[in-house]
């Protein structure tokens, strides 16, 4: 029984997703339905959490919009998520960056990860 469920879940999982980690700045293209038409809306921010659960994986992106912090959680393999683009890699030493919620301005910056030679 569980083999059937596992096979169905693997069939629905997206394979074209880039590798990203907490601290990375990403642009998530989200499908937004307005009336009878559909368009793409970009949500750019820092990944503060990733939850790896196969088909039920999710990640949280945080951005500052008009001086107000906005967080949005996306299901990784959802049909609403059109694409994910990694803008820059962040060098962090935590899996969950919830401490960024209390910080603003320069203290909320994340160092850029340098490429290995």
From Swiss-Prot:
* Pfam family of the protein (one): Ribosomal_L19
Task: Output the Gene Ontology terms for molecular function.
Answer: structural constituent of ribosome
Enumerate the Gene Ontology biological process terms. translation
SUPFAM superfamilies registered for this protein in UniProt: Translation proteins SH3-like domain
Q: Which InterPro entries match?
A: Ribosomal_bL19, Ribosomal_bL19_CS, Ribosomal_bL19_sf, Translation_prot_SH3-like_sf
This protein's GO cellular component annotations are: cytosolic large ribosomal subunit
UniProt keywords, alphabetically:
Ribonucleoprotein, Ribosomal protein
Give the family from UniProt. Answer: Belongs to the bacterial ribosomal protein bL19 family.
Per the entry, what this protein does is: This protein is located at the 30S-50S ribosomal subunit interface and may play a role in the structure and function of the aminoacyl-tRNA binding site.
Query: What name does this protein carry?
Result: Large ribosomal subunit protein bL19
Q: Which organism is it from?
A: Vibrio campbellii (strain ATCC BAA-1116)
